[in-house]
Amino acid sequence: MSSSQDYNNNSNNTPARVSSRKGKNLHVAHRRSPSELTNLMVEQYNLQRQLEEVQAQQKLLEEKQKQQQQQFTYPSAQGSSELAPPPISSGYGGNRSSHSRSSSINTHRRTGSGSGGTAHGHSRRHSLGLNEAIKAAANQKQSNRNSLSPTIPNEAKTDSSDDIGSFKFPPSGGDQGDTSGQSSSSHNRSRSLAYGQQSFKFPPTPDQSNDTRGNSLLPPNPNFSVTQSPDRGHNRRSSHFRTGSRGSGSNTNTDGINSNWRAQQQSPQQQQRQGGLLEPPQVGFTPGHKPRNSSYGGGSSVSSLQQFLPNNGGSNNSGQQGGHQGGGNNGRKTLFAPYLPQSSLPELINEGRLVTGTLRVNKKNRSDAYVSTDGLLDADIFICGSKDRNRALEGDLVAVELLIVDEVWESKKEKEEKKRRKDNTLHSRPLTDDIHNDATSAPNTAEGSVTGTSKEDGAGSNEEETGGLARRGSLKQRPTMKKNDDVEVEGQSLLLVEEEEINDEIKPLYAGHVVAVVDRIPGQLFAGTLGLLRPAQAAQAARDKKNGKESTVQNPKAPKIVWFKPTDKKVPLIAIPTEQAPKDFVENHEKYADRLFVASIKRWPITSLHPFGTLVSNLGPIDSPETEIDSILRDNNFLCDEYPDDDNDDIVSVNAYDLPSIEPEFENTQREEYLNDYIIAFTQNGEFVDHALHVKRISNTKIELGFHVADIAYFIKPGSSLDRKSKKRSSSVFLPQKTVNLFPKQVNKIVSFKENEKNLAVSVVFEIDTSNFEVEDLYIHESVIVPKQLVTYDAFDTILSGQSVDSISSATSDYVKTFSLIAKEFRRHRLSNRSLGITPNLTLLDQLDDEKVRLDLNIFKDSLAFDVISEISHKVNSAIAAKVHAGLGDQAILRRHPLPTLQKMETFVRKATSLGFKIDTTTSSTLQNSILKIDDPVKRKCVETLLYKCMSRGRYYVAGKQDTDSYAHYYFNLPLYTHFTAPLRRYADLIVHRQLKAVLNKQVEDKDLDSLKAITDYCNFKKDCAANAQEQAIHLLLSQTINEMSETAGQLLCMGTVVQVYESSFDVFIPEFGVEKRVHGDQLPLVKAEFDKNERILELWWEKGVDSATYIPPDEKSSLSYRNSIKNKYRTSALQAAKIQSKTALEKSTTPADSVAEKLAKLNLEPPKLVVPSLKSNELHEVEKDETKSMPSSPTQSEIPKNVRTNSSSRISSSGNTFSLEPYLQNTITRIEGDSYIQVIKELTQVPVLLRAEIGMALPCLTVRVLNPFAEEQ
C-alpha cells in the first residue's frame, strides 16, 4: 500500500507517518464521526483531569493545615475525614471522589496513558506521520478516487494501548493497578469521554471567582510557557473576563439556552462544569456504521463527556458547582469538545501530532472552514462542520489534529443525505451535489446510486446524462433560504468570494478538526441587527402572518436573551442578555428592526450552539449615511475613539500631544543636510506629506536617487500616550466617504514635509549606474531636507500623461518624468523582464500588500503616479529590510507575502488554461509576466481576478519567529521586505523606523521576541481590517451610485465578460464598474440548462417571450424571499432600459446621473462610464462622458462551436425603432431547435447583463441577470 493509501484509507491499527513540505512528521488520526473523540483528545483530557485531581488534593491539605493552625489543636476524627483527600479511585455517581496518582504532577507526561498503561500504541485512534499525509494528498489529486475508505475492522485488543480507550476508573477502594485493569476490560467507545477543563487550563483554587475555564470564549495566552497562567490571555480583553459577582450557582435548573443564560453567568465555576452531567449518546448517533465492539466500539462521543469532568459532584466545591450536580444542569448536552490544555500544545505541535494555522470560514457554508498552515502543507486543511470547527472564529490561530480525509468526507456525505431527506428532496437532487456551492462542475457520469437521478424539480425535461454533458436537462435549484443567503454573500462584495470545489471527484487533500484556539485578537466588534427571535423563527412568523395563519412561533413574554445577527455572514448569531437591549425592546422589537447595533462576543459554552455576547452600542438607523460608515468602521474594529477631540480645532492645540521641539534637532551635526538639492515632496490625498524624492547626476555614468521619509520616530517616543493610542489604532483607514488617520490632525501637520522649510527626515540614497541601473552604493541616515515643491499624485498623473499643470514648474515636470524612467528600470529588474514599461500594471494584485489612499469606485483603476512611487518604494523598503535584519537579526520586523498553496496555484493554472492562456508558475516574476503579456485589458483583468483569489495578503513578522525559507515577499519577488515609507499611516513603519535608528546609532537592545510578535500580529489584524473596511465602503458607494443611475429604469443594462462557467450558473466581469458577479440559472426564465464540462459550455434553454428583467421566480413570492424584506423599486423591461440609456447618451439630457456626478465630485471621484454599444461599426456613446471607450473584443467566428450558429432572427429586433436591444445582442451565440430557444454561454465572450442594486439591507447588494435574447418586443 502506498503512503497515500495509508493516509486516506488506513484501516488497520498500525500508525503510519508522512512528512510535510518542511520535512516535519505529522500524525493523522482515525475517526468515524464528528462526535467521536480521537486518542489524542481522550489522552489529554484524562491527563488533565488527573492533574486537576492532584491539585485538588493539595488544596485540601493546605486547607487542613490552615485550619489546624487556627485551632491550635488537631481536628476530630470526623473533621479529619472530611478534610482528608478522597479515595484514590473515582466513580461516576453524583459525588465523585478525586482520583489520586502515585506519581507527581511533573511525571504526568502527555504521552502517558490515563490508566497507567504505556503511552504508545493506542489502538482506537492512530496517527499517521506527515510524510504519508503529503504523499497521500499528492496521490489523491492524481487518482480521483471515488471509493470510500474500507471499514475499519473490529478488534478486541487488550494490550496497554487500549487502556486509554475506556477511561473508566475502578470502584472506591481499588488501587491504581485495578484502575488500569478495569480500563482495559471495559474498552467501549459508547461510554462518554468527558473532561472538565473546558477552558483548557489547570484549575484555580475553589475560591477563585473569576475562573473562566468552562465557557470562556477567549483562548489562553498564546505564550506556550507552562509556568504562565492562561488567565493572562483573558487580561488582554477585560470585557470578556467573567467574574463570580452574580452569586452562587444554585439557580441553574433550567431547560435551555434562553432560560439558562443567567444561571450560566452566576458562577464561573459553574461554567467549567457546564458539560458536567451530559446525555448519553443516542442510538444511531453515527448513522451508516455497524455496531462496533472493537477499540472503535460505540464511539466515545463529545455529547457524553461526563466521566471526565473533574470534581463532578464533589462535595468540596458544592457551593460553586452545585448547579451542575445530579441534574442541576438539567442534562444539557455537550455540543463541542473542550479545548486541549494550552500547556500541552507546544509538545504536541513539535511532535507533529497537531498543526497550527489561521482559520478561514467558508462564507457560502459557514459551518465549514479551512485552516492555512503557512506553507507547512501544500493545501489548506478542510474543517467539516461546526462540531469540527469547535467555536473557532474567522482569523483565529488554531491547533488542528489531522484526520483521515475519506472518513471526514463520508461523514459529510451522511450529513448532507440527512439534510436532503429532511427537505424531501432526495428524489430530486443527486447526493454528490453541494447545495452550498452551485459553482460546481459535476462529474461527467453518474456512478452507482450515490448520484441519484439527474433531473431536478422543475427542470422541465426527462432527458438523461449523455456523453460529456453533466446533469443534462437539469437546472440546479437552490432552496429559497439558500438563494437569499447567496444574494447577501455574493452581493455584498465587489468580487466573488473564493470557493473550493469539493465533491467525490475532487476531495480535500487534508482534513482535520480544531482542538484548541491558540490565539485570538482581543476586543473584536461586530455590527448587526437585534431581534427577539432567531432568524429562522422570525422567518416562520413572517410566513404565518402573510398566509393569514395564527403564528406557530410565540414571542417569549420575558426572554432572558435576545438575538444579535451580525452583518458579517462569517460571524455566528450571538445571544445578548435582555437587560442590555433597549428598555422597550421586548414590547416594541419591530421598531428596532431597521437599526444597527454593535456587539462583541464574550464567551461560547460547549453546551451552546451560539456564543454569548455583550451589546456595545446602538449605532442608529440602517439607511443613515453616518450609520452606514460607522457600521463599517465598527465592524472592522475601528472605534475611532483614540482622539475624541481631534475634530475640534479650538480644543486641540499644537502642544496637546507633548511633541518635542524641532528647532534644536536642526542643529544636530549627526544629521545629513539636503538643503540645496531639488527635492520634490508628494502627497496622495493632500492631508499629509510623508515622502519626498530627489535625483541628480554625480558623473557621466552615475546618478543619485534619494528617497526621504518623515522622521516619525523623533516625534513619537516609545511608551508615550500618543504611542499607545496610535498603536491601538495601528493603521489609517481610507474610505471614499471618510478618512480615519493614524495620528491626530495636528501631529500630521507638524510631522509632514512643508514646502521651502526645513524638515526632519530619514533618507535612503542610492548611487545608480545608468548603463544597467544597478545600485552601486547605498547610504541611509537621519537628515534635514528642504523640499522645493509639493506635488499631488493628481498633478503627477497629469504630467505623465503629457499635459502641463499651471502650478508645477517645468523643472519639476522634468524631474517627475525622470522618476518615471528610473521606476521603469527598477521594475524591469525586479520582474526580470527587459521589455516591461511602467504600464500595464496588476492594480488589483498590488492591493494584496497595501490598501489604496487615493480611491476610485473601480478598484481596477490605475494611477501612474502611484505606480512610479510604489516601484521606488519597493526598492527602499527592500534596502531597509536588509539593513535592519543585518543589524538586529531575529528581532527585525519585516513583511512577507506567502506563496499560494500548491493546490490553489494548480487550480488557478487550470482555470487560466481553460480560458486559453499559458501561465508559467516557475517564479513570481514568470507568473506576473504571463499575465502582463495578455493584450486585451479586460481579459487580463479576468485572469488577474482569478489569481487574486488564490493569494493571501502580506503579513508582518518577527524574523526570529519565522522560518528563514518563508522570509520572502512572493508577489514583489523580493527576498526581504518591510514597510518603512509610509510612517504617517502605518504603525508598523514607526516600529521599523525605531529599529533602523537603533542600528544606525548602534544602540541595539535585546527585545522580547514574543512581545514583538504580539505587535506584528495586531498590526496584521488591523491592516486586514482597514482593507476590508475600504472594500466595503467602496461597495456601499458603488451600490448607491448604481441605484441612483438606474432610478428611472430600475436597473442598468451593460455588457459583461464571462469568466467561469458552471453547471447551472456562470460568472461575469463588468469592466465599467470593476465588479465580478454570478448569474444564477434559477433566477432566469429557463426551461433547462445543459453543461458540457469538456467543452466548458453552458447552454441556456429559454422560455420564449419572457423578459428576464421583470421575471420573478415563483419561490421569491413567498415570505422567505429576501425581496419581501426590502423596499423594492419599480423595474422596467429590458427594452425600456435600453431606450432610456440610449436616449440619455444621444440627448445628453439632465438625468439622475448628473446629481450622481456632483456627489462623487465632492468626494474627488469620477462617475462610472457606462458604454452603450451601437450596431457593428457605428460609434459607441457614453452616458456619462463624451469621450469614447471601446468595448472588449468580440469573439470571432472561429470561437463559435461548429454546431452553434449566430441567429438573431427570433430575438428582439429594432424593426424601425431608433432604440433597441439589437446592439447588446448582436454578438450573442444562439440557435433554435424546433420549439427550443437556446443561448450558448462560453468563457471570455460578452453577454448583456442587467445590473441592479438592492437597497434596504444592512449592506446593499449588487445582483445581475443575463438578458433573454428571445424575449418578445414590448
UniProtKB/Swiss-Prot annotation:
GO biological process entries: intracellular mRNA localization; mRNA catabolic process; regulation of fungal-type cell wall organization; regulation of G1 to G0 transition; symbiont-mediated evasion of host immune response
UniProt protein name: Virulence protein SSD1
UniProt organism field: Candida albicans (strain SC5314 / ATCC MYA-2876) (Yeast)
Family indicated by similarity: Belongs to the RNR ribonuclease family.
Molecular function (Gene Ontology), one example: mRNA 3'-UTR binding
Annotated Polar residues bias: 72-81, 139-152, 248-263, 438-453, 1190-1207
Name of the gene: SSD1
Span list, region Disordered: 1-38, 61-124, 138-337, 413-488, 1174-1217
Keyword terms of this UniProt record: Virulence
Listed Gly residues bias regions: 320-330
Residue ranges occupied by any DIS3L2 C-terminal domain in the UniProt entry: 1050-1136
InterPro entries: Dis3_CSD2, Dis3l2-like_C, NA-bd_OB-fold, RNase_II/R, RNR_Ribonuclease
Consequence of gene disruption: Decreases virulence in murine infection models.
Compositional bias (Low complexity): 1-13, 95-106, 177-187, 264-282
Source lineage: Eukaryota, Fungi, Dikarya, Ascomycota, Saccharomycotina
GO cellular component: cellular bud neck; cytoplasmic stress granule; nucleus; P-body
Keyword Lipid metabolism attributed: no
Pfam (any one): Dis3l2_C_term
Domain RNB: 688-1001
Record's compositionally biased regions (Basic residues): 19-32
Stored PANTHER family: DIS3-LIKE EXONUCLEASE 2, RIBONUCLEASE
